[in-house]
Structure formats: C-alpha cells, structure tokens
Design a protein with these regions (language model features):
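Helix-rich effector regions associated with P-loop NTPase G domains
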Residues: 6-12, 24, 47, 52-62, ...
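N-terminal "pre-motor" subdomain/linker immediately upstream of P-loop NTPase catalytic cores
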Residues: 19-25, 29
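A short macromolecule-binding patch
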Residues: 35-46
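Phosphate-binding glycine-rich loops and their immediate beta-loop-alpha structural context
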Residues: 102-154
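Canonical P-loop GTPase G-domain recognition
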Residues: 136-187
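Walker A/P-loop
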Residues: 185, 190-191, 195
Length: 300
C-alpha cells in the first residue's frame, strides 16, 4: 500500500516543491517519486491553510496528502518555512534575482537599470545584472558597462543568445539554486530562457518601434529546470519597477552605502540619511549619489 492511501489516522505527508500555479490549482513536484514513478501532481489547497492565512507560492516546499495516483491529483496540507519570498510576483525560496536589461535595441537607460536594481534589492537576496544583446555592441563598449556596474557594487554578466560561452556562464552561475528574472519587457528575457532551457520554446515578441518596448510574452510564474541544475522563474514583465515608499529603507538598497557601512564607516546619528547631516561618515563621491538624493526627495 502506498503512503498516500495509508489508513493511518495521521497520514505521512509527501514533500514537494510548488512549480507553478494553474488557475486554482498548484502543480507540485515530489521530492521522491510515487509508486509508478509519478513526480508531478495537480493539487488543491487544504482549507486549513487558507483559514490560517497561509498563502502558497511558487517555489514553496509543501507537504501533500490525499494522493490519487491514477489521476495525478493530491492536496497541499502543509507549508514549510521560507528562506525568502517575493511579493510581486509571489515567489518563495529565491536565492538570486537576475535583472535583465538590453545593451541595445532598446539602448540601455542607466536610470531605469538603477531603479530595477533597487527594486530587486528589496528582496534581500543576491542581485545579478545581466546585460543582454551584447553582440550588438563592440566588446569594449559592453565591457565598459560591466566596469561601470562594478562601481555600483555589482558583478554583471554580458550575454548574447548567439554566444554559447556567455549562456554557459549564466548556467554555471545559476547551478543548484533558485533564480528569478526581472527587468523591462523587450530586453530578451524569453529569448534568454529559451537559450538556458532549450526545450521550453517560450513565445517571444519584437520590440515596438515607437516606444522601444517589448510586448510581454510571459503570462504566469513558473519554475523551469536548468540543464546544469537549479531552477529558473520567469515573471510577467513591467515597464517600471516598484520602489519602497518608506525612505528609511532606501539607503541600504544601495550597495555603495552598504559596503561603506560594512567596512566600518560610521555616522553620528543612527537615522542619518547621508545628505547634509553633521557627522555623516560616508564618502559621497560615487556615481549614483545624485540619483540617491533624488529618490529620497521622491519618497518624502
């Protein structure tokens, strides 16, 4: 008798990860296969999860019971603690956020890139910029962008779907973990996923000539297996990132500020905004400082 059909009054739960949301159902992949090798189950949620206010997200580790192996159906009965979670989109246990922007077609807007990076920093996980369409620039120009981002506190990767080595570098970076792509539409996110996971063949769309924005082609959040290990999530695109309304959160979203504080720089006041306060211990000679000041004003 299999574990899910046991008559025990306290049935053993099977551990699995939520791979996708489909309407009102969860697609869960079991950590260990079922009696006939089944790994994927279409699951409902037990009412007690909803009554307890527990939202189940893609990426969650869950316990399932009530398995109907012939129909590949079950129910999610428990939710494990998360190492991290994103609210927009709803995604759990992410280890890296990959911010994808194009170096050309459309040309890279440093202010837009900065805002996407700040939005990604609100997740509290590692942020990695991916500079797509690198083949449309001279190598020196693409490398100059990587050097510029190093000054912002990031190790960026230049990528091109026609350059197998650059795709391999991304796959190596993602091996073993869970990562999510974000960034404006039209920068090649779906093309990148197709290159990383060739079996998917996600639909792509050309960039519109008038607005230089892409027509988004991803409709829902789903985890995809990477050939070298790890999981990758695509998210519905958006043209502007979301920044925190609370200006107190803003300073620590900048690696330029975090790195100075971690290196021992100290300010006289605990709530120093690093503007004109007396006793501010930070060096302000970094490229994005004026942008930081502007964002503080916007949040006021």
């Amino acid at each position: 008798m299999d574990r899910c059909s046991s008559p025990s009054p306290v049935p053993e739960l099977l551990r699995g990860r939520v791979m996708a949301l489909e309407a009102n159902y969860l697609r869960v992949r079991l950590e260990q296969p079922g009696p006939d090798g089944q790994r994927l189950l279409l699951c409902t949620r037990r009412a007690r999860l909803a009554h307890g206010g527990q939202q189940v997200m893609v990426g969650d580790w869950v316990g399932v019971d009530g398995c109907d192996w012939s129909a590949a159906r079950a129910a999610v009965a428990s939710l494990e603690p998360r190492s991290s979670h994103l609210q927009r989109p709803a995604l759990a246990n992410v280890e890296q956020v990959l911010v994808v922007v194009a170096l050309a077609q459309p040309s890279l807007d440093p202010e837009l890139l900065s805002r996407f990076l700040l939005s990604a920093e609100t997740t509290g996980v590692e942020v990695v910029p991916l500079l797509s369409k690198a083949d449309l620039l001279e190598p020196a120009a693409a490398q100059a962008w990587c050097e510029r981002l190093r000054g912002w506190g990031y190790e960026a990767l230049c990528i091109s779907q026609s350059n197998g080595a650059s795709i391999a570098a991304v796959q190596q970076r993602l091996a073993g973990g869970v990562a999510v792509l974000c960034g404006p539409s039209g920068v090649g996110k779906s093309s990148l996923i197709n290159a990383l996971v060739p079996t998917l063949e996600l639909r792509t769309a050309a960039v519109s000539g008038k607005l230089q924005r892409g027509r988004h082609t991803t409709r829902h959040v789903e985890l995809h297996d990477l050939p070298g290990g790890g999981l990758l999530a695509d998210t519905p695109g958006f043209n502007r990132p979301q920044l925190p309304a609370d200006r107190q959160q803003l300073p620590l979203l900048f690696p330029e500020i975090r790195n100075q504080l971690e290196a021992g720089s100290r300010c006289r006041f605990r709530d120093c905004r690093h503007l004109t306060e007396p006793g501010c211990g930070l060096d302000r000679s970094w490229e994005r400082y004026s942008s930081y000041c502007q964002l503080l004003q916007e949040a006021s």
